[in-house]
Amino acid sequence: MQPIELAELLTSQAAVLTSLVVIGLILCFIGYKIFRVYSAVIGLFIGQLVGIYITINYYENALIVILASAIVGALLFALIDELGLIVTGAAFGYFVGVYLLPEYQVYAFVLAALFALINLFIEKPLTVLITSVIGASAIALAVHMGITGTHIYDILNDPKKVFDAIFSNAYFDLLWFTLVLTGIITQYVTYKEEREEEE
């Protein structure tokens, strides 16, 4: 299979919708429980971006540099919980700022810094909330894309369309809110049961 064929397969509507739903369900209902894995995936992507930057600007052997930096990023984020907490909080705060005040970009950065800091101190409640919101958003986006036929390239061209899609009408609002609430309750109940079993 050629790289172009593989890229077309991975970005096909069925693959994208399936990925969004599966990742959304995992994050929504067991996001806190698998936080190390989730954090390692974030590190992998950040390491990959660093590797691409190094390759473009300084180095010739692209595959080795990108692979090495992705592995280092994944290991760092898996071993140092604070890195995942900071990045998760910052990303959440940034998108909240973009959604609430799209005209004032500076507030998105302020909220990103604020949520990154807060997530370090109230790790469990905020991480449960954030993973539930991200998971519910992924599922609601997948449902909207499936119904309307919107393709992932349309979303990538203008990320603000994500919010328009998720909150496009009362039904999507209800779906999103129900998933967030169910995700939070499920994660807390699971965590509580595990703590009781340990005692």
Swiss-Prot record:
One of its GO terms (cellular component) is plasma membrane. It is a multi-pass membrane protein. Keywords: Cell membrane, Membrane, Transmembrane, Transmembrane helix. Pfam families: TM7S3_TM198. The keyword Lipid metabolism does not apply. The chain crosses the membrane at residues 10-32, 37-59, 63-80, 83-100, 104-121, 126-148, 163-185. InterPro entries: TM7S3/TM198-like_dom. It is found in: Cell membrane. This is Uncharacterized protein AF_1434. It comes from Archaeoglobus fulgidus (strain ATCC 49558 / DSM 4304 / JCM 9628 / NBRC 100126 / VC-16).
